[in-house]
Design a protein with these regions (language model features):
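A Trp-anchored, charged/polar loop motif used as the substrate-binding/catalytic surface
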Residues: 8-23, 70-81, 92-97
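Intrinsically disordered, low-complexity Ser/Thr/Pro/Gly-rich regulatory segments
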Residues: 2, 44-47, 107, 188
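Short N-terminal edge-element motif at the start of the domain
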Residues: 45-93
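Active-site-flanking beta-strand signature of metal-NTP-handling nucleotidyl enzymes
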Residues: 32-48
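Catalytic micro-motifs at enzyme active sites that drive phosphoryl/nucleotidyl and oxygen chemistry
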Residues: 22-26, 84-87, 95-104
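Histidine-centered divalent-metal-coordination microenvironment in nucleic-acid enzymes
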Residues: 95-121
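Short glycine-rich, low-complexity/disordered patches
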Residues: 38, 75-95, 148-166
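Catalytic "initiation/cleavage/transfer" segments centered on a nucleophilic residue
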Residues: 1-29, 118-207
Length: 207
C-alpha cells in the first residue's frame, strides 16, 4: 500500500515499521534522542589505489555498519561504567531504520534514523577521532563497514540540519516534535528514488 504527500507516493509499510522502531525506543528509553543520518558510498572508488582498501560496497555494508555501531556503543558504555558517577543502568540500546536510495547518477546512499537513550547521549558532538562522541562513532562505523581508512573529514556521513529530535511523551512539545520527526520519515519512505527488482533490500530496521 502507498500514501501520498508533497514528496509524491510513499510506501506505507516502511512508515509503519519506522513508527514501531520509534515506539520501541520510547518504551525502553522514555527520553529518546532520534537522529537523521545519511550514509554515502565513496564517489570515486578508482582513486583508492591501495588494493587492501578497496571499498566494500556490497549489500551487506549496512548490516556491518549497524553491527560496528553497536560494538562502539558497548565499548563506550564499558569505559563510562568504570566511572563512579556513571550508573550501569544508563545504557543505550541502538534502534534504527534505513532505506536505500539512488541518485539520478546511480550513486547509492542510505537514509537512516538512529535511536539512542537521551540519558546516555544528549549531544551529537563534533567529529573528533580522539573522543567517543555520537558523531565520531557513527562516522567511523560507516568507514569500518566500507573497509576503508578513516579520514579527517568524515565526508561520507552527512548529518542533515535540524536532524536531532528529543522525545519524551511527558513533555509539552512531544506531539509537535513527533509530528516534525514523522515529516522527515516521509522523505525516507518515498517511492521515486527506490530501485526495485535488483535483488537487494530497500529497507531494514531493528527488531
Amino acid at each position: 500500500m502507498t500514501y501520498d504527500s508533497e514528496f509524491g507516493s510513499h510506501i506505507s509499510l516502511y512508515r509503519d515499521r519506522i513508527k514501531q522502531v520509534i515506539e520501541d525506543s520510547l518504551n525502553e528509553h522514555p527520553n529518546s534522542m532520534i537522529l537523521r543520518v545519511d550514509l554515502h558510498d565513496p564517489i570515486d572508488t578508482e582513486e583508492i589505489d591501495n588494493p587492501f582498501f578497496q571499498p566494500r560496497v556490497d549489500s551487506a555494508a549496512i548490516s556491518r555498519f549497524t553491527s560496528a555501531l553497536k560494538a562502539k556503543l558497548e565499548h563506550d558504555k564499558h569505559i563510562k561504567t568504570q566511572r563512579k558517577d556513571w550508573p550501569d543502568t544508563r545504557h543505550s540500546t541502538l534502534r534504527y531504520a534505513w532505506v536505500r536510495e539512488y541518485t539520478k547518477n546511480g550513486k547509492r546512499h542510505y537514509h537512516l534514523i538512529l535511536c539512542f537513550n537521551q540519558d546516555a547521549y544528549y549531544h551529537v558532538g563534533d567529529y573528533d577521532l580522539n573522543r567517543n562522541t555520537i558523531r565520531t562513532m557513527i562516522t567511523t562505523a560507516w568507514y569500518s563497514a566500507l573497509g576503508i581508512p578513516i579520514d579527517s573529514s568524515g565526508k561520507l556521513v552527512n548529518y542533515p540540519p535540524n536532524g536531532k529530535y528529543l522525545l519524551n511523551r511527558k513533555r509539552d512539545n512531544f506531539e509537535q516534535t513527533y509530528s516534525d520527526l514523522m515529516n522527515r520519515v516521509d522523505y525516507m519512505t518515498k517511492v521515486r528514488t527506490k530501485i526495485v527488482g535488483d535483488g537487494d533490500r530497500n529497507f531494514g530496521c531493528s527488531r
